[in-house]
Amino acid sequence: MLKINNIRFGIRIVTYPRSDGNTPILLRKTVDSVLSQSYGNWIVYLAGDAYEPASEFNSYSSWFPQGKVRARNIFADPERHKFKDQRWRLYGGISAINKCLDWMHADGISHVAILDHDDIWNHNHLKTLADAYTQFPEAQFVYTAGRHASMGVLPKNRDVQVRYNNLPPMEEDMLHSCASWRLDNIPLRYRYGCRSSGEPQCGDMTMWQDMKSFMREHNLRFYFANKETVFHDGM
């Protein structure tokens, strides 16, 4: 029987006040999916992206058991204020995300698990990641499959075996909340990027491109765990 290493995941959640007022409803579902995890060695880093009212953001900490959340409202020139065109949606949250990753790294978090504030993890998500890091200890980036409400299960090509498949993430073929990596070994941060046409592209797409280049340059390994463990409803 596989003996899981004592991996403590830092769960990165960045949230902001949606214009439709639905942040508390969606975030509650996201948090409930964390609380339902069968793997219990985790702590949430909950970052507000210039979240106002601050009292609403502060109330979210009460949803967690004691010692299971660290919360900080980050005021770092949020993209939704900086950009007035489509870039605010494509680049939204990058400044706060990077501040949160820096915070986690300073706290000594070795494994980061990404969870967007409107996504839901299946109860076995962290267990799947922990199993993968234990069975394949050279893996520096582990991700799972996820279901998008309108696009179906991603990635589309899932014909892989349980081994070091070294399958890198495809920019438009994975859900952001499926990703995890060794924060202690990978110093990358999100940035504003563009397609070859010069059009701006989503921040996580640029991150996966940078991740593939970094991993290739440093001869590091990916692992794709072929289980569907994340849901995104596309709202």
List the predicted regions and their residue ranges.
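Short beta-strand-to-loop acidic/aromatic patch adjacent to the donor-nucleotide binding site
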Residues: 109-120
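Short beta-strand/loop segment that forms part of the nucleotide-sugar
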Residues: 41-51, 74-76
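Conserved donor NDP-sugar-binding/catalytic core segment of glycosyltransferases
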Residues: 127-156
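Short, acidic, metal-binding catalytic loop of nucleotide-sugar glycosyltransferases
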Residues: 26-41
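Active-site donor/metal-binding and catalytic loop motifs
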Residues: 147-155, 177, 223-235
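Acidic donor-binding loop at a coil-to-helix junction in glycosyltransferase catalytic cores
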Residues: 198-210
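Active-site-proximal specificity loops/subdomain of glycosyltransferases
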Residues: 56-109
